[in-house]
Every structure is written in structure tokens, then in C-alpha cells.
Amino acid sequence: MPPPIGYCPAVGFGGRHERSNAELLAAHVAGDRYAFDQLFRRHHRQLHRLARLTSRTSEDADDALQDAMLSAHRGAGSFRYDAAVSSWLHRIVVNACLDRLRRAKAHPTAPLEDVYPVADRTAQVETAIAVQRALMRLPVEQRAAVVAVDMQGYSIADTARMLGVAEGTVKSRCARARARLARLLGYLNTGVNIRR
């Protein structure tokens, strides 16, 4: 059973100390049964958004996020504290998404055009769908890099650490992704509608 809202095991009810991500992770490793839940809740929205941007469907994103959180929960003891806990969590989520994409690549379940139903015809919704479709057409490595840098706001260095590649690799993946996105989405600036 989760602790009551406002309860922090370190200080009790009404305490003013909010534990840092590193403190929560260390408390989890030390046996605090509420610490990981608190850490996960703190980052859930951003991690889910990252998973959604890196996955083909919302179901894949949910599954990848669950896989990532189980992996983080189990592997917390091996965290070396040489990077921010949030960067570590993001890397685990990205890796879980990429793993699912690689496994699904051999067995596609639906054509890309069928994945995103378009019920609302407003320009904003159409643009968001077009961008999401264009992202899905990128190779997974390019997509992960450009989502982290351009959509999540991570630096090249942080993205390189999250993805486990060199900074130059992140730069080249982002450049290739941006060039392809510009080609795929160039029609948005012309007022011309593409075939659905």
C-alpha cells in the first residue's frame, strides 16, 4: 500500500525536506520501499513523453516504459552516481524503446498510415500527427538522438551519455534526422496538403 500523500519516510508528515533523485535512489537501494515509487512519480510524465516519442504506438510506449522501470528498479544498485539519476532513467527508457523497435522491426503489425487515427481535423492536430509520422520514418538511432536533443532539450553530451555513443555520433545522427525531417515536412510551410 502506498504511503499517504504528503508523507516522506525521511521526515514524516509535513516535512520540508524533499529528497533529491540521488537520495531517493540510494534510499531505494537501502530498502526504502517507497523511494522508487516517489522517484518514478516525479519523472513519470517526462519519461512517458520520451517513450511515446521514441515508440511507434502508445501501447509500445507504455510497455517500454514498464520494461524500463522494472529494469531501473532491479538495476538501481549498480548505478554509479557518475551522471544525473534523471539522465540514467532517460537512457534506460530510450534503450527499452529501441529494444522494442528492433524486435518489432522483423514483425511489423500495421502500416504506419494505420497507426494514427485522425479524428480531429484542426491544423494543430494535423501538424502533430505529421511530425509523429515523420519521426517514425527515421531510423531508430536518428530518432532517439533528435528526440532527446530537439524535443527533450538534452545537450549533445547528455544525449551521448544516454545513448552510449560519442558526441560526434549524436551530432551526425541529429543532422541526418533534421535533414530528413525537413524533406518529409517541407510541405507544412507551403500550404500544400499531402495524401493521407
Curated annotation (Swiss-Prot):
GO terms for molecular function: DNA binding; sigma factor activity. SUPFAM superfamilies: Sigma2 domain of RNA polymerase sigma factors, Sigma3 and sigma4 domains of RNA polymerase sigma factors. Pfam families: Sigma70_r2, Sigma70_r4_2. Residues 39-105 are annotated as: Sigma-70 factor domain-2. Sigma factors are initiation factors that promote the attachment of RNA polymerase to specific initiation sites and are then released. Extracytoplasmic function (ECF) sigma factors are held in an inactive form by an anti-sigma factor until released by regulated intramembrane proteolysis. GO terms for biological process: DNA-templated transcription initiation. The keyword Transcription regulation applies. The keyword DNA-binding applies. Belongs to the sigma-70 factor family. ECF subfamily. It comes from the Bacteria. This is ECF RNA polymerase sigma factor SigM. Extracytoplasmic function (ECF) sigma factors are held in an inactive form by an anti-sigma factor until released by regulated intramembrane proteolysis (RIP). RIP occurs when an extracytoplasmic signal triggers a concerted proteolytic cascade to transmit information and elicit cellular responses. The membrane-spanning anti-sigma factor is first cut extracytoplasmically (site-1 protease, S1P), then within the membrane itself (site-2 protease, S2P, Rip1), while cytoplasmic proteases finish degrading the regulatory protein, liberating SigM. Disruption phenotype: No effect on phenanthroline induction of katG. The sigma-70 factor domain-2 mediates sequence-specific interaction with the -10 element in promoter DNA, and plays an important role in melting the double-stranded DNA and the formation of the transcription bubble. The sigma-70 factor domain-2 mediates interaction with the RNA polymerase subunits RpoB and RpoC. A motif (Interaction with polymerase core subunit RpoC) lies at residues 63-66. Gene3D superfamilies: 1.10.1740.10, Winged helix-like DNA-binding domain superfamily/Winged helix DNA-binding domain. Interacts transiently with the RNA polymerase catalytic core formed by RpoA, RpoB, RpoC and RpoZ (2 alpha, 1 beta, 1 beta' and 1 omega subunit) to form the RNA polymerase holoenzyme that can initiate transcription. Interacts (via sigma-70 factor domain 4) with anti-sigma-M factor RsmA. It comes from Mycobacterium tuberculosis (strain ATCC 35801 / TMC 107 / Erdman). NCBIfam families: PRK09643.1 (NF007225), sigma70-ECF (TIGR02937). The gene is sigM. Residues 130-181 are annotated as: Sigma-70 factor domain-4. Keywords: DNA-binding, Sigma factor, Transcription, Transcription regulation. Residues 156-175 bind DNA.
